[in-house]
Amino acid sequence: MNFTLIVCTYMRPIPLLDLLNSVKSQTIYPNEILIIDGSTNNETEAILENNKFQNLQYFEVPNEHRGLTKQRNYGIARVGDITDVICFLDDDTILEPTYFEEIINTFHYDDEIVGVAGVAINEMRWIKKETNKKYSKYQFYEFEGYVYPEGARNILRNILGLQSNLGPGRMPEFSNGRTCGFPLNEKIYEVDLLIGMSFSFRKVVFDNIKFSHYFEGYGLYEDADFSIRAQQFGKNVITTKAKLLHYHDPSGRPNQYQYGKMVVRNGWYVWRVKYPNPSLKAKFKWNVIVILLTFIRFSNIFTTSKRQEAFTETMGRIVGWLSLSFNKPKR
């Protein structure tokens, strides 16, 4: 099975080099590596000139193609005809040596699988369940012999009956599912949502759909939107055998006010892609959760040192929510 790796990057030459060095150590190597660079300087190009990698092609995108969503589509348009699978990785990730081998093995495992994602092992918070210990159903999520300590927002959702009754990676009718991922148990799980830091799809998916123009710019939740639309062609899964490290880099994020608006408006958009006509109960829950999460973010004004960020994001969330009454996002 031939596969292409696409990395969309912006002003991160050193993290990109670290990623590519981890690609070089893979047990199976990509047939193509496309670097889609939206940087406004030549540092990334220079570092790739000084560090050669097999099968790598570098593309400096023009200004009109900058931004994650546009760069993804730009890369897809340049994939070779022999490719069966297109893999995307964030430029701030580092792979375990068998990452690609496990991704490709998962596609071989079931022809109905069209999307596969791995897991970031440095973000794992799952712990083995102790046999004789009782865990609060409000403070812990129990799953297949493991427990996951809930954060403040999920504890409140548990208490208020606003938690999803579906497994991780699944989107309930009111949209807000569990984001805890899966324990490292070497299993494969079917999901609705794959995370853009590490997802791969069969090329047939890209022959039919592309990343949505709605998310051009920062692209918050564009991966969720694409994952949902990809399900018309087959199943999405997460394999806990495909492991990587993810080092979140905050650069490139819009100001907190705009980010707060995006959280609500883009969240509404993705919800309606999956559920165009949700029930009245689901609508009620979605709105209550928006209010709850906005209140929690507002409380950060008094509980964290980054008070200005908390205040402006809260305002963005409020404005984003109110705007839905007269200006809903359009597909």
For the regions a language model picked out, list residue spans one by one.
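Glycine-rich, basic loop-to-helix element that forms the pyrophosphate-binding segment
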Residues: 62-81
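Short beta-strand-to-loop acidic/aromatic patch adjacent to the donor-nucleotide binding site
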Residues: 82-94
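Conserved donor NDP-sugar-binding/catalytic core segment of glycosyltransferases
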Residues: 98-166
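Active-site-adjacent helix/loop segment of glycosyltransferases
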Residues: 236-309
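Short, well-formed alpha-helical segments that are part of the catalytic scaffolds
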Residues: 12-26
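A short, conserved alpha-helix in the catalytic core of glycosyltransferases
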Residues: 185-186, 192-209, 216-242
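A recurrent flexible, glycine/aromatic-enriched loop bordering the glycosyltransferase active site
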Residues: 158-171, 181-200, 231, 253
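A conserved acidic beta->alpha catalytic loop
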Residues: 29, 35-46, 93-95
